[in-house]
């Protein structure tokens, strides 16, 4: 990735990926903590992906939290519904696993699983 303003472009790629996988909504990205630099092989970053309708009205029921980090040299994305802490969490590393948010054990995917799995795949493509 070759950007002049890397942080802004990186956030834009995440937002556009969410726009694509969660149509017809529009998304913005707010960094919560961590860093990711173009030339750095390490990543540890948490962002919120905020959702709006086409008229700009916030739709917080669709907001997401995205964590990106390396585990054993492999990129891992963890995606959860920001305002629904009891919903399953997507772990997308070498394998894709849905986890119960209360106990961390593997669980069945929710009905909206394909959207979040597609989002994770698109973001991984941009990063790797």
Task: Please tell me what each predicted stretch does.
Residues 54-94, 98:
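Aromatic- and glycine-enriched beta-alpha-beta binding-site module
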Residues 16, 29, 71, 119-122:
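Low-complexity, intrinsically disordered/propeptide-like segments
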Residues 27, 88-91, 112-113:
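A generic alpha-helix propensity feature with a strong bias for hydrophobic helices
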């Amino acid at each position: 990735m070759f950007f002049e303003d890397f942080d802004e472009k990186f956030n834009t790629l995440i937002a556009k990926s969410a726009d694509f996988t969660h149509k017809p909504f529009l998304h913005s990205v707010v960094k919560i903590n961590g860093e990711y630099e173009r030339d750095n092989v390490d990543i540890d970053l948490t962002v919120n992906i905020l959702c709006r309708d086409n008229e700009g009205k916030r739709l917080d029921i669709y907001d997401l939290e995205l964590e990106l980090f390396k585990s054993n040299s492999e990129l891992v994305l963890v995606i959860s519904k920001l305002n629904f802490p009891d919903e399953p969490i997507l772990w997308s590393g070498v394998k894709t696993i849905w986890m119960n948010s209360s106990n961390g054990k593997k669980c069945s995917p929710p009905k909206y699983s394909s959207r979040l799995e597609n989002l994770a795949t698109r973001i991984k493509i941009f990063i790797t």
